[in-house]
């Protein structure tokens, strides 16, 4: 990963004076393009009174007239919502408003497991049969071409209100109210479902409806849509309303989350409130969450909130459980060497697949699809990716060949498929893997001025908030830091804490999930990237940094060390001039997964520079390869030995060779495409099966006959040790293990001796 500083012209001095901006806030506003009197005035002073006329949104007047007609004539109205925080708040906004207007209004939230996302034909048929005369979708509907058609043909009008991307064909609804409808005149196009619902209710009531802003804000933050433009008004004013809310449901939810009314910010909503609402739909029927938000009874609301708290705790447990099982699958099948992951277990809980896939991407930096089987026998799953790999573009061209259902966007997707298509999908997904744009670049805002840091510094920064999509929380750089008081913390010592000192100032920094850091690595740190927050300890409030990234450089030593042992470090650092590999197959792993610039990667056999600092990232297979790497004139060598070139980590035991051969003789229709499926049945990983088969081919025990693997009827009797491939691999494994396990000082001496020959 590359870090790059944002650049922008400075704010005019008169604007800085008019809005009383400190130097940090002034720089941050300039970087975000909020650099004129009009823009700054909007940022500080705009309220719901400044929102655009709802009538500008596509089909708004038509929708409002139809809703008023239904209310006047006493028609039954059903709000068709969604099971995430956005859909839940949108359903609540619409239901509450129509109830105030005296409508015969009901709501329906589809069940994630039985109904799936969006319009469902069976549920539409039920709603129509139950006497509904008007369906209003919220946070869904644009995919419901057939469902909407069915309702309209049965004299039930459908008003689609949504914000998701239109597909090739739009539903022929009575009205479609959408913030990004082609050609519409509404000036803001990135509302969430709750934002669209709130806009409709403004139009219905001919009022700004500030009492709905707390719900619209939760949907906005939960769905990660823009918090700029009108989104800024929704979130800023919504937080103000939330902090003085009298909704029993929200007050109970806030209490259970351990938050305090009056001091809740956007981070609290994103990490504590929205996830609790999401948890309901992940594990149960999301109607429960709507009941909570609509409740006007304190005791009832607390009872529902307590149930939601149980579900949220269960969601956390299931996420950890499925994640751990996925990591076991990866190692059991040697998939850590792949560029992509497709993980399946029929027992995985469907409600947490997306959360787990996201955690695995964060851990492995690999596009990941996690699959399970539902009660109907359908294999369903969620996928997640990262910047540089468009998941939708990767799967969309092959959806008709492998998938029964598919939808998503750049970095997330949902899909369904037949169970017998999992292995072919895994293979195709891996074969087609390609990262666009090279090394991922992340931007930071500015160098942190270390002198005079106080809690008031954060107040200055927060003038640029509330933060979210489109206005991200600022990231600051601390260059060439002096690090002291370093220690690890947490149950498993996965987190670190230390003090950074520079130019007369210091800052306490916490690094979550940065347990790979240790005292040996601290001299290599050239930049620390942090976001600032407040820490309260024993009633004392202080400023602290939350680490978001690191950059490394070779330390300037008075006496250079020719060889440095970094085998035990769990982090590949971007400080070497050149990263050397013995095996060409490891190049995409280093480039894509380890995020090292391809221009800095070379094969040992092609490298001809001198005087550079180099890192050996994979392990040589033998003494000859190691000698070839060490015959160059380096300034310094870092021994990382992270990857290897071995076909297997260890030679399978003899009984496994017998089991595989027996299986081949008893299954004469076995094809190469079946090897991966057969491996778990035999208690082996895929690489071990391939290794055993290669030995068998060499010894003449098996052959391919018209594309099928069959055993030779009368093979020559000879021991496994007659295989040159087996014996050569065994020797390579021994050499690799020696290099990986040799005591540090002994290894350094050994390599030094080779370089001095």
Which sequence ranges carry the predicted segments?
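Hydrophobic helix-and-loop "lid/oligomerization" segment in the mid-to-C-terminal part
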Residues: 8-134, 154-155, 172, 205-424, ...
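Histidine/acidic-residue-rich, glycine-tolerant segments that coordinate divalent metal ions
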Residues: 138-191
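Glycine-rich, anion-gripping cofactor-binding loops and their flanking helix/strand elements
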Residues: 117-126, 130, 134-145, 601-607, ...
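A short, gly/pro- and small-residue-rich
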Residues: 149-161, 198-204, 623-641
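Acidic, two-metal ion nucleic-acid-processing modules in DNA metabolism proteins
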Residues: 99, 233-323, 385-392, 396-403, ...
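Short Gly/Thr/Asp-enriched flexible loops that form oxyanion-binding sites at enzyme active sites
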Residues: 90-94, 145-154, 163-164, 354-357, ...
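Short alpha-helices
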Residues: 172-222, 628-629, 638-641, 651-659
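Short, ordered loop/turn segments at secondary-structure junctions
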Residues: 82-83, 110-113, 140-141, 163-166, ...
